[in-house]
Amino acid sequence: VLLSTTVIFNSSFWAQCDSIYTSFIILAILFLHKDKPIASFVFIGIAFAFKLQTVFIIPVLLYYWISTKKISILHFFIIPAVDVIMCLPAIIMGRPFIDIITIYAEQTDYGKLIQMNCPNFYALICDGNDITYYYLFKQFSVFLTIAVLGIMMCIIIYKKVDLKNLETFLLTTAWTVFTCIMFLSSMHERYGYLLDIILIVYAAVIAKHLWIPIVSTLISLRGYCYYLFSYELISLKFTAIIYTALY
C-alpha cells in the first residue's frame, strides 16, 4: 500500500488527508469482518469526522446489516455520536455547534462542475468544464446512484448473498465505493483513493484479479499527473472508457 503511486502522489507529494480517513475505513472493514461492530462503527465515525467521502462506505454497512443480521440499526447512531465527540475541541474553542452539523451540507455545493478530472460516467457524456451540466445532472446523479445501490440491495436480498464471506464482502465494498465515484456529481480524481486502497487490500488478501488494482491505480496516476503537472498521456474521455469497463 505504501508503495502505491496513489499513496505517494496523494499523501507524500500533494499532502492530502485521504490516507487518514481511508485508514480508519480499512480498520472499520477489518473489525466488521471480525464481528466487532461497535469498534467498526467507531472507526467509521472517526473517518467521517475527517472527510465527507466516508459516506461512500455507508451502503456497505446497510448491505451487511441486511445480509448477516449481525449488526443492529442502532449501531448506525454511533457514527454521528463519534463525529460530534471528534469535533468537541473545535466547540470548546468557540466554534458554533450548528457548524458541526452544517459544514458537510455546505460542502456538497462546492465546486459546481459535474466532474473534476474524474474519469467517471459524466466524463463520457458531457464536458465537465461546462457548469451547465452540473445543474442539469446534479439531482439526477443522486437519484441514479441511489437507484444503482438499491438494485444491489435487492440482489443481496433475493440471492441471499453472504457478506460474511471475506472475498464477497471486499468485492461488494469496492463495487459500492466505485458506484459512488462513477455516478455522483462533482467527483475529483482524489476520490478514487479509497477505491484504490480497497482493491489493493482485496488483491493482497484474496490473491486474485491482481490486474484490477493495477489498472485502477494507473488511472488515478493519470489524474494526478494531469492536475499536478498538466501532463496528459491519454485523454480524460478515453480514460473514462477504461474506467467504465473496469467498473
Feature-to-residue mapping (PLM):
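Transmembrane helical bundles and short interhelical boundary loops of multi-pass, membrane-embedded
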Residues: 100-117, 173, 206-247
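Aromatic/glycine/proline-enriched transmembrane-helix motif characteristic
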Residues: 107-182
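Transmembrane and membrane-interface helices of multi-pass
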Residues: 1-7
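Aromatic-rich transmembrane-lumenal/periplasmic boundary elements in polytopic membrane proteins
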Residues: 75, 80-120, 124
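Short acidic/glycine- and proline-prone juxtamembrane loop motifs at membrane-interface regions
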Residues: 12-20, 188
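Specific aromatic-rich, kink-prone transmembrane helix
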Residues: 20-37, 198-199
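Membrane-interface alpha helices of multi-pass inner-membrane proteins
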Residues: 8-9, 27-31, 38-63, 85, ...
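Perimembrane helix-loop-helix junctions
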Residues: 56-81, 92-93, 194
